[in-house]
């Protein structure tokens, strides 16, 4: 089964339709339609890679504004990155940026209910920023692969590691069960090989 997976990866770019949870294919295809050459895709690639730079810079600005407790600027930055990510069809990134925009406007994540406490809004923005970065890394890897760049799955940014560590902390009871299952599986092949 593994060799088939390897062949898929080598046969060309990933199928965008397999990643609907993070990328709106029809929106992204509108960007692709602007390419003069479907094989090179230089124009769309420049737009996408420009977004990568823009997102990285905006993440840094958001972190600075969190530290400065500047909700108005955080709302503006969330709005800015929401628009850029929506243009490319980056579903989860857009949704997260909209939440940052709402929290920065002293609202809840939906933007419908007022949230007067600045510290609550700042904490929500920080948590949402961490989530957005994780979703951004997923779609960044997908698009870099789409444009023919080799991307290692092991490459993780610090925020991805933090989210995975938080998930591990939430599920500590499952680990002993897995170990017990692994020990049992290890013993079973020995018994069947006799």
Write out the residue ranges for each language-model feature.
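Two-component system phosphorelay core
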Residues: 1-76, 86-194
């Amino acid at each position: 089964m593994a060799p088939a997976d390897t062949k898929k990866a080598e046969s060309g770019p990933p199928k965008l339709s397999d990643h609907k949870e993070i990328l709106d294919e029809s929106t992204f295809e509108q960007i692709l339609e602007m390419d003069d050459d479907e094989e090179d895709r230089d124009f769309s690639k420049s737009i996408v890679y420009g977004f990568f730079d823009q997102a990285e810079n905006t993440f840094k600005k958001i972190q600075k504004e969190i530290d400065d407790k500047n909700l108005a600027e955080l709302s503006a930055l969330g709005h800015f990155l929401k628009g850029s990510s929506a243009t490319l069809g980056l579903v989860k990134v857009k949704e997260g940026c909209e939440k940052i925009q709402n929290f920065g406007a002293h609202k809840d994540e939906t933007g419908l209910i007022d949230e007067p406490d600045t510290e609550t809004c700042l904490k929500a923005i920080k948590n949402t920023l961490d989530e957005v970065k994780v979703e951004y890394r997923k779609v960044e890897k997908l698009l870099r692969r789409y444009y023919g760049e080799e991307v290692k799955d092991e490459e993780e940014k610090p925020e991805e590691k933090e989210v995975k560590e938080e998930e591990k902390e939430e599920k500590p009871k499952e680990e002993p069960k897995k170990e017990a299952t692994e020990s049992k599986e290890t013993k079973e092949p020995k018994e069947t090989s006799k």
